[in-house]
Swiss-Prot record:
Gene3D superfamilies: Winged helix-like DNA-binding domain superfamily/Winged helix DNA-binding domain. GO terms for biological process: response to stress. This is Transcriptional regulator SlyA. SUPFAM superfamilies: Winged helix' DNA-binding domain. Keywords: Activator, DNA-binding, Repressor, Transcription, Transcription regulation. Residues 2-135 form the HTH marR-type domain. PANTHER family: TRANSCRIPTIONAL REGULATOR SLYA (PTHR33164:SF64), TRANSCRIPTIONAL REGULATOR, MARR FAMILY (PTHR33164). HAMAP family: HTH_type_SlyA. Belongs to the SlyA family. The gene is slyA.
Length: 144
């Protein structure tokens, strides 16, 4: 019987994000919005749109639409990079601070609940295995 590991991992990510999405409904953010805000907050300050798109794993045109919406909400600003006028740097605004705190809190508490009953060693083993899978995939992509 063929392994369904890839499908299982994809489903896990989908339901995990859906649970967080449900818990963040009061903030009136779409999943794309909170994932983007969370990623901006985790990356070094003033990332370029290209770097952010790579970190999130989406295409830059999709990210631009999301950033436009977040800028309209007053949660981010974008400015032209001094070294490359084509590049835009992204910065969270002060208005984003309480939202980021709530998003981080919900993500952290949800992670804790999801991982309840799983030991630290088991989590570390899983993280290591996922890292190996990702490395294998990257190597396969680089061969093409």
């Amino acid at each position: 019987m063929e392994s369904t590991l890839g499908s299982d991992l994809a489903r896990l990510v989908r339901v995990w994000r859906a649970l967080i999405d449900h818990r963040l409904k009061p903030l009136a953010l779409t999943q794309t919005h909170w994932v983007t805000l969370h990623s901006i907050n985790r990356l070094p300050p003033e990332q370029s749109q290209i770097q952010l798109a790579k970190a999130i794993g989406i295409e830059q045109p999709s990210l631009v639409r999301t950033l436009d919406q977040l800028e309209e909400k007053g949660l981010i600003t974008r400015h032209t990079c001094a070294n490359d006028r084509r590049a835009k740097r992204i910065k969270l605004t002060e208005a984003a601070d309480p939202i980021i705190r709530e998003v981080d809190s919900v993500i952290s508490s949800t992670r804790g609940e999801i991982l309840s009953g799983i030991t630290t060693d088991e989590v570390q083993l899983l993280v290591g295995l996922i890292g190996k899978l990702e490395q294998n995939i990257t190597e396969l992509q680089n061969k093409q």
